[in-house]
Amino acid sequence: LLRLTEQIRNCMLVHRQPDAVPARQGQLDGARVWREPVLRDDRVFLRSDEDPKPAFTVDLLLDGSASRLHCQETIAAQGYILAKSLAACGIDVRVSSFCSLRGYTVLRILKDYGHRGGERRIFDYFAAGWNRDGLALRGAGQLLRAAPADKHLLILLTDASPDDSHKIPPTGKIPLSREYDGQAGVSDTADEVRALRRGGTRVAAVFMGESANVPNANAIYGRDLARIRRMDQLAAAAGRLIQDEIRELAD
């Protein structure tokens, strides 16, 4: 936990861009001069804030389907480590899980933004049911509308094998219902990822699954993808993706 915290904090120190904030001394701000005689507000200068707040939030979305049953304790522990590290760096983080049960896709918020000490609830994570990844991503996008920053990074833990017992209903282009698995599931998930990115959300994934599903992961997430071989590598892989985001914001 300490090593991950230091890595993220050091990356922020290297790439941070100080914000200009109102002050009683510094560089005169012509747009604020009127405030002194009118409002008796003498903060008409700008100074550099050497400790700016991170300009983005992080959402960690955990696949909570039955395929993760064998490693659910490790997933919870890794989510806890990541959330604690981000909180120590002042980055707002939300940790959620998703699964599909009896035709419903359930998004469960384990730890919300600004919930101090809420990291312990991540250990309530459990695995059950199916994984309709596309619908889960759409729901996550809706939740991001209330996020406390302008920029967002959504990281999904995935096996790149969307699978649900309920079929895809007919559409104008495809008049017959289809099973939600294989290429149909991959295409649906990729469509939702593209929609989120068009809306300004950065979407990345930590992939742990069968080698046969690597092409699926590449098709859905492109270059914003980190592959792990063991679930205890989840926090470190997500940390690398977050450091990439910090560098992107600084460019």
Regions flagged by a language model, labelled:
Residues 1-251:
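Acidic, glycine-rich A-domain
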